[in-house]
Design a protein with these regions (language model features):
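Cap/lid segment of the alpha/beta-hydrolase catalytic domain
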Residues: 1-16, 73-81
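Alpha/beta-hydrolase fold nucleophile elbow
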Residues: 30-42
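Hydrolase active-site cap/lid region
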Residues: 49-93, 158
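Active-site nucleophile elbow and catalytic-triad environment of alpha/beta-hydrolase enzymes
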Residues: 94-110
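Acidic catalytic loop of the alpha/beta-hydrolase fold
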Residues: 124-129, 156-157
Length: 175
């Protein structure tokens, strides 16, 4: 994963590849030139938020239980986000150098730069992407057009009615 290098870390390539994919999508004849939505859950939720920040072509986001958020929480005695690196390696000698790299790619840090419409949802019983980590992302989003749906007894999955709410919300943002 090259987690000790910001320039060679796995997620750098993932994020840059996703931006290139959005560039490609925008060249297709099916693209209307106005509406490019991104939607994903867990790692895909993190990518959706990052893509909306990194690509001006993205017009709206639907992210559910985004991963890669507040990963350093384990270093401070709280539940951390997926992939739980600091849960397993919190005593490593180079942990503070690694934390700098992970922090750079943290979903909550991307969220601070998000000014596009976003629909977000998560379950309070999620053991993969802790609700506290998802809240850290949500609370950082400055966009005035944002909607949050919380399902108290749901884990790392989505109820059908929340899928429907997200879909209707996305359609309401068609330009």
């Amino acid at each position: 994963m090259n987690i000790d290098s910001r320039e060679h870390y796995y997620y750098r390539r993932v994020y840059l590849s996703a931006v290139r994919f959005i560039d490609y999508l925008s060249t297709l004849p099916q693209f209307d030139g106005k509406n490019l939505y991104v939607c994903g859950g867990s790692q895909g939720g993190a990518l959706s938020i990052a893509m909306a920040v990194l690509s001006p072509k993205v017009t709206a986001i639907e992210a559910f239980f985004p991963a890669l958020a507040d990963q350093e929480a384990y270093l401070h005695g709280r539940a951390g986000g997926w992939p739980h690196y600091f849960y397993f390696h919190k005593d490593d000698e180079d942990i503070h150098d690694i934390a700098k790299v992970v922090r750079y790619y943290d979903t909550a840090n991307f969220a601070r730069l998000l000014h596009r419409p976003i629909f977000m949802s998560f379950g309070l019983a999620d053991l993969t992407c802790a609700p506290t980590c998802t809240y850290s992302t949500w609370n950082a989003i400055p966009s005035p057009d944002k909607k949050l749906v919380i399902t108290p007894q749901v884990g790392h999955w989505r109820k059908l009615d929340v899928w429907d709410q997200g879909w209707k919300w996305m359609l309401s943002h068609k330009q």
